[in-house]
Structure formats: structure tokens, C-alpha cells
């Protein structure tokens, strides 16, 4: 974990992401189980989003927990560790499993003004996952911050996360929209002759400091 992660952890919204894949014919059962889990997590201080992967992925489901800051995160985790509700939940879930977890990681928003409540409600999104070269974090963040207002002017809400436990060296560049129509309208403004196209052309010869490892869309289910 880089020093950037430590500096943002105390102040920005903290997220944990659990990626699940339903067993064949068990998608509805897995969603029902996630809804039950969400009600427990919310009582214990977390904000929960259940995100369905779309194009570019393999029908995975992200179970996302958010807290306002690291202190809220730690307090909630301590409650979970001694919760009888979780003992009972997992005893029931393990009797008839509906899916398997394929990955998990935590991440912090680079915008230290963001709170967990800023992510309530329904939305669709596009996310690009980047794996940064060692020692190039600040350079990559600078590029993200330069591109962010361009995409915002095209209609996207931009959130940038630095992953730590579970996915060190990863950055998740997330574009959020109210609907698929809004996503399409925004992306239609990024073609030839656009401000985005000019920016991409101006950076074409820049040093390669990160590799894009994933690019997919999705939407919330709760």
C-alpha cells in the first residue's frame, strides 16, 4: 500500500467490494441472500449497494459496503465481529449456498469530501480498472485529475478510487449516470472533434505508467 492510501484512508469514504458469481439457476436466491445481508450491514453502520455487472464482465455481482471515514469503518467492523446476527445468517446461507465469492478488496475515494450517503439511490456506471507501475501513483492521479473535469462537462459524475487490501496498485475510475440514456448521451460527446478526443491526442505520446486491466458497465439493483 502506498503512502497515498494511508493519507486518504482517514478522511475519504471507505469502500469494501465483494464480487460474487451465482451458481447456475441460483441468481434470484443469491440476490435474496444479499438483501438479507444488506439489512444487517445497514443496521451496523454501513451503506450498501448491490451492483450488477453488465457489458465487459461475466454477470458478476458487486456487494459494496461504504462508510464515511476510517473511524466509522472500524467501529462497524468491530460490531460485525461480535454479531450474533451474522452467525445466524451464515449458518442459514451455508445450508444452501447460492453463489461463490470470486474476489474482495477495499478502496478509498480520492475525493476526501465524499461521504457514503453520496452513493445512495439507483445509478448506472462505467468503470475502468488500472494497474499502476511502481512509484507512478502520483503521476497517474495527476492524469486522472486532468481528465476528470472534461468527462464531467460531458455529463458524467466521476469518482476515482485507490484500492488497497486485496488489490494493491489498482485504481478504479468510475463514471456514474442516472440512466443508460444519460450514459449514452455522455459517451456520444466523446467522439472525434470533442474536447475528450483532443485531450487523448495530446497525451498519446506520454509515458505509459499504468495498464488498463478491465473496462465494464453495470447498474445498481437495490
Predicted features by range, described:
Residues 10-222:
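Short S/T/G/P-rich N-terminal loop/turn motif that feeds into the first structured element of a domain
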Residues 1-5:
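Bacterial N-terminal signal peptides
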